[in-house]
């Protein structure tokens, strides 16, 4: 995940609702480095949070494994991610796909969801609220398939 790309996706998503990042309420779901752990050292979530804070966003976060964290000079506390709390935010960003997250409930409660973990792949409702990283949203797709061989074959065949 590239933090600048995620921040750009948030900006583009909010623009759909005629909102800017400045003064928007953004909820980060998951700040840990990976799923179901408490370690957030070197987590890309921290860079995403810094970028959005620098753009004037009002950030909150939820992480069942990280009850508090330092962001710059501030200490943030994990908030409870109830449907009512989620609905208060202009955008929800799924940065770590903890097993405890009810993705269906998150999407149903949110106005806009930026899904960086493909955790909404099985949802069929509220798709208009979801922007997925690498899912044809004019952003790079991070595939595990190495298609460089396919490209080389096509080039060789065309000559």
Predicted features by range, described:
Residues 1-159:
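Structural/interface elements that position substrates and couple domains in central-metabolism enzymes
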């Amino acid at each position: 995940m590239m933090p600048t790309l995620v921040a750009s996706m948030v900006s583009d998503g909010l623009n759909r609702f005629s909102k800017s990042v400045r003064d928007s309420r953004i909820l980060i779901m998951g700040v840990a480095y990976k799923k179901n752990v408490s370690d957030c050292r070197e987590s890309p979530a921290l860079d995403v949070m810094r970028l959005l804070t620098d753009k004037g966003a009002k950030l909150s976060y939820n992480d069942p494994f990280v009850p508090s964290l330092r962001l710059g000079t501030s200490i943030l506390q994990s908030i409870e991610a109830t449907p009512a709390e989620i609905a208060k935010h202009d955008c929800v960003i799924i940065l770590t796909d903890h097993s405890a997250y009810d993705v269906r409930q998150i999407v149903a409660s949110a106005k806009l969801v930026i899904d960086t973990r493909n955790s909404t792949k099985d949802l069929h409702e509220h798709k208009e609220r979801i922007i997925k990283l690498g899912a044809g949203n004019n952003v790079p797709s991070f595939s595990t398939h190495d298609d460089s061989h396919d490209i080389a074959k096509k080039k060789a065949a065309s000559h």
